[in-house]
Amino acid sequence: MLPYQAAVAMDYAGYQRQPTPGHPGSHMATMGSLGMPAVPFTHSWMVPTQDLCAMPPYNKMTGHQQPPGAGMHAQQQPLEPGILELRKEKSRDAARSRRGKENYEFYELAKMLPLPAAITSQLDKASIIRLTISYLKLRDFSGHGDPPWTREASSSSKLKSAAIRRSPAVDLFEQHQGTHILQSLDGFALAVAADGRFLYISETVSIYLGLSQVEMTGSSIFDYIHQADHSEIADQLGLSLTSGGGGGGGSSSSGGGGGGAGGGMASPTSGASDDGSGTHGTNNPDVAASMTQASTSGYKGYDRSFCVRMKSTLTKRGCHFKSSGYRASDATSNCNNGNNASNNAKNVKNPGSNYSVVLLLCKLRPQYTFSHSRKSQPPLLGMVALAIALPPPSVHEIRLECDMFVTRVNFDLRVAHCEPRVSDLLDYSPEDLVNKSLYSLCHAEDANRLRKSHSDLIEKGQVLTGYYRLMNKSGGYTWLQTCATVVCSTKNADEQNIICVNYVISNRENENMILDCCQLEPSPDSIKHEEGLGNDKSSGSPGGDASGEGNSHLSAGDMKLNSPKTDSEGHSHRGRGRSAAASHGSSMNSLTMIKDSPTPLGVEIDSGVLPTTVATPVPAATPPVQSTKRKRKTKASQHAEDQGQEQVISEQPLPKLPTMEQRDQQPRSRLPSIVDEQPSSAADSAVKDLEQAMSKHLPSPAAVVSVAPPNTDFSADSLLKQQQQQQQLDPNEKSSTIQWIGTPYQQPPAPMPATALLRQLYANRESVIRATARQTPTGVGPGVFYGDQQTGPLPTPPGSESSYENQYLQLHSAASGGHPGGQKTSADAFTNLVSTYGGYHSSIDYHNAMTPPSSVSPRDSNQPGKAAPVLASNGGYDYAPDPLRGQYATSSGDVVPATLPLKPQASYTATMHPSGSTTTEGGVTYSNLDQPQYFAPHSSFHLYHKGSPASGWYSTPSXVVDDQGQVPPSCQDQYHHHHHHHHHQDGSAGSSASQASERWDFVGALGKVARMFFSARKGNPG
């Protein structure tokens, strides 16, 4: 090494203030250059270091060089001190001046970097050079790549003056636009040179990885990628890695890259060609050869998409996730003990590193070529990418937007549980998906990509898939993207299952194209049995099908309903509901989905549960014409519709998409196609007549479907008139959007004593009034609170409106406020007010095989992020958002129309007949049919009413139930207050009725209802 170079290098490194003294070889060179004999001189000028101790630098040298020259000191001593001092002073001044000039130039250069002054003023020289080189290369990368990124103004032939005039505005606009784009990304942008160094990385990397833009720019990408992912990124980008890892690079870079203490600093001449695209040797010690698009590569084209683990300094606590030895985005040091034993070895390797999984969406950038022949591939200048950061797995709550739904899958990608809101977005119900493999649902062309994502998920613990196509149930496909995370048990660190957050990113496409035989008419193994509204569908999918059967409002909470456990294993629900139903002896009609593989979720049908109507299948394919809204119906289902067409609406899941709020007005392609399957069956004619009479004053379902203009006249006369008109239009339409809960259709048509009839009317009427107290916030219809089944006005006696208004609105607004979309199923709102009439005592004796609500903890049954009320599993309260939906006992032999009874019977059905309720997804607890639906036994509440109001087993919608299952005080007070008032009465029907009427002032309403009812009955037998 030349002494001068050594001196300069040492100065650069800041080891010594004076270049020469610290290096024994360099004095000799200096002396020689002055024309003096080097050897004797060395001895002579080392002498004074003993006697004249005034020169500290020389003292450092005395240790090595003093002994040999001891004899000559006396002779030379008088001549040396002055000369040496001058010489040293001169050399120090020269070095100081040189450094000053260098520093000045460096800082001038730093000021020109496109970085804030606060950053450039703090940079050291090496960083300034590194950033400058990166910036210059980036200009080349942008200008010489294909397509060039130079601005049109400068490259076009426009007048210079025009370009000058508009440039400040353009610059300002571009600056702001660029900032906004970067801030709106769920990740950061980067550009990588052909040798694998970062040319640019956006400042937002600090948000997602906690890393510094300045530190990363110009560094090797491999310094920030998990060791196990190096080969993958090299394959994807066409880089050749050096076999040794960090040392010297390929042929020409070995000297520069590996030499000296430079580490990452390679020699500037190691690039193989001027444009940096040479294929042998690079400036990056990790990379032996620059990017090439080899014909042998498994990738075609310039687009790439893959997941890698990148270093992250963001430490998260509470890690229950695995990222192949490094919990994604978690401090491995304190999380290692949670990983599988197989991963511990990897943890030891890099104990202090945290890694976060990112999806890199890359486009390779070729050099612009002027020849159009293109016989050979143009050289690659590098790669541009967006790195989409996955939400750190330690984040336990993710806000679900209107286009997202959650599934839980097993390690073979078989769906274990699906959220009910899937039916808002796709034409599948949750049961359709449960136990299906994603491989069987995914478009054939995307299967390989899905497989790659699957293996990444198992290896890295988290993955964000690229866009892939999920085949629709009835034809065509929908584009999805899925973020999947492996969830580990907090106790034993076993990997339990995979949580997938699915983003629906398109409408249904090519709906008339059949891509797979599963999209054809249903085969025997995928038949929906019409078993009436029992909706045992909830079979195992905790989230029941909200769309097709009465469970559409169910959400996580309800889903949980079925699960004896919290549904953490989605399978046990069905069994439990079924056995309960069977033991109850109620042949509940339920809609069971028989799926391809008889899993506990899907197909357990036993004679106790299925009524005789089981045999009528509903073809699952939708006719192409109305594929978004209607399913073809068999006779049975059409009959059901006659009885309860309104159910179509009642069962449509409450739109989670804001754009679907008006979904009744405009069919949206994302609405489930099975919306109209009305599972129900014939009821006796007397039942129908009475039901018709009861509902005469309500708008008919037809009106609802067609979304009649809002009618605000709630007077009985106008409503009767309206109903009669509807009846004339459709004489067969027997049911209304409101299903009176107590209506005898639910019971054998035995005549009912007048007092019971009045009490029933009273209770029913109250629920209607409550329901109509205010228009639902979701905009589904004017005054309705019937799970969006009603779009027309409902009758509300004038006196009653104010009495409910405040508490109802308050509860409802609380319910809808916390819901992800701000929308809440009206049914949820209902559940807040339901069961206040549970105190009516009926002479009928009830089964007391009930499980107290505590069997399911509120926390278990309440899943954050979903609009679902807590439903106690088969026992306890069934407060589903749909308590309305299914909790009306279906008549024992017959299938009951699937319509939604209006008085939410959460208090009744679930509590009374928990054992008989197959709390299937919808919270459809069907009790034995011999029991009246409108009376809750007085004892039930004494049995279950918990002392602490915050117990959370009331069905406050999940939006109103916090993580601990507590009802916020604002709701608790009113809500529990009502319950205490009405349910702890002593059981005498008369006294409970009188108390209730005093409390709610419903005497006038009752009279009005009775008049309406008797005038409407037109002599039908009671």
UniProtKB/Swiss-Prot annotation:
Cited CDD domains: bHLH-PAS_trachealess_like, PAS
Tissues showing expression: Trachea, salivary gland ducts, posterior spiracles (Filzkoeper primordia) and a subset of cells in the CNS.
Keyword Transcription: yes
Residue ranges occupied by any PAC domain in the UniProt entry: 465-508
One MF term in the entry's GO annotations: sequence-specific DNA binding
Alphabetically ordered keywords of this record: Developmental protein, DNA-binding, Nucleus, Phosphoprotein, Repeat, Transcription, Transcription regulation
SUPFAM superfamilies, sorted: HLH, helix-loop-helix DNA-binding domain (SSF47459), PYP-like sensor domain (PAS domain) (SSF55785)
bHLH domain: residues covered: 86-139
GO cellular component: nucleus
InterPro entries reported for this sequence: bHLH_dom, HLH_DNA-bd_sf, PAC, PAS, PAS-like_dom_sf, PAS_fold, PAS_fold_3
Impact reported for residue 233 to N: Malpighian tubules empty into a single large sack that is attached to the hindgut and no ureters are evident
Modifications made to the protein after synthesis: Ser-673 phosphorylation by PKB/Akt1 is required for nuclear targeting and transcriptional activity.
Residue positions, PTM Phosphoserine: 673
One Pfam family named in its UniProt record: PAS_3
Biased composition (Gly residues): 243-265
Region (Disordered) location: 239-289, 525-686, 849-896, 962-996
Result when mutating residue 579 to A: No effect on phosphorylation by Akt1; no effect on transcriptional activity
Gene Ontology biological process terms in this record: appendage development; epithelial cell fate determination, open tracheal system; epithelial tube formation; Malpighian tubule morphogenesis; open tracheal system development; positive regulation of transcription by RNA polymerase II; regulation of transcription by RNA polymerase II; salivary gland development
Subcellular location(s) of the protein: Nucleus
Domain (PAS) ranges: 174-244, 391-461
Mutation effect (residue 673 to A): Abolishes phosphorylation by Akt1, nuclear localization, and transcriptional activity
Note: Readthrough of the terminator UGA may occur between the codons for 958-Ser and 960-Val.
Function: Transcription factor, master regulator of tracheal cell fates in the embryo, necessary for the development of the salivary gland duct, Malpighian tubules and the posterior spiracles. It may induce a general fate of branched tubular structures of epithelial origin. Functions with tgo to regulate expression of btl.
Subunit: Efficient DNA binding requires dimerization with another bHLH protein. Heterodimer with tgo.
Stated name of the protein: Protein trachealess
